[in-house]
């Protein structure tokens, strides 16, 4: 089936020096291999994540670059694409909340939960992507407050200005799903 290839790129101040390179600390410690193994664990646990296919870590001297290949989630769109209209679908937003809660209950802390890292698939399926720097502690429920605050900031940033009044309605439905 179709796949997605994602290169690991730096952001923030570190990107000034190098957009692609990281300090090489070994293949198993590389960001691409850590995310590959985490996705494999989450997929095996039945959580809605893309199935990992391959990881790449190339190094020269003390620097490395990396990439991750996953199966494409067909017919999926980022949650950001749903931020239109002034009447949000409460059912969809509740499913998003329930899905995030599943991850937290399973012990997953997502380092960058935002409207681009939540995919809406066919039949109200919700998937999370981009688990770079995420943490997984099976059997330990995660306090999701930080993740939810990050998502709320992302919603405020990406929601169209002329329809901002719909955001609290969507957020309330998301939290109702999360709290079920």
Give residue spans per PLM region.
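Short acidic-glycine loop/turn motifs at beta-strand connectors
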Residues: 1, 121-123
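Conserved short alpha-helix within the protein kinase catalytic core
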Residues: 90-97
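Conserved hydrophobic "DFG−1" position in protein kinase catalytic cores
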Residues: 72, 120-121
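Conserved catalytic-loop position in the HRD/HxD motif
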Residues: 107, 112, 130
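Conserved ATP-binding subdomain of kinase catalytic cores across diverse folds
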Residues: 1-77, 98-106
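C-lobe/activation-segment region of protein kinase-like
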Residues: 127-180
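Hydrophobic residue at the +6 position relative to the catalytic HRD Asp in the kinase catalytic loop
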Residues: 113-120
């Amino acid at each position: 089936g179709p796949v997605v290839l994602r290169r690991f790129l730096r952001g923030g101040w570190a990107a000034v020096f190098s957009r692609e390179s990281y300090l090489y600390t070994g293949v198993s410690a590389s960001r691409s291999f850590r995310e590959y193994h985490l996705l494999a664990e989450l997929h095996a646990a039945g959580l809605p994540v893309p199935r990992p296919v391959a990881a790449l870590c190339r190094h020269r001297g003390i620097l490395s670059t990396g990439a991750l290949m996953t199966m494409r989630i067909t017919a999926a769109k980022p949650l950001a694409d749903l931020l239109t209209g002034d009447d949000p679908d409460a059912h969809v937003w509740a499913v998003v909340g329930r899905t995030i809660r599943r991850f937290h209950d399973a012990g997953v802390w997502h380092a960058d939960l935002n409207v681009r890292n939540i995919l809406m698939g066919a039949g109200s399926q919700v998937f999370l992507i981009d688990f770079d720097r995420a943490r997984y502690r099976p059997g330990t429920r995660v306090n999701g407050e930080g993740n939810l605050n990050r998502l709320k900031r992302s919603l405020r940033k990406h929601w169209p200005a002329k329809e901002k009044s719909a955001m609290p309605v969507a957020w309330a439905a998301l939290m109702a799903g999360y709290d079920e």
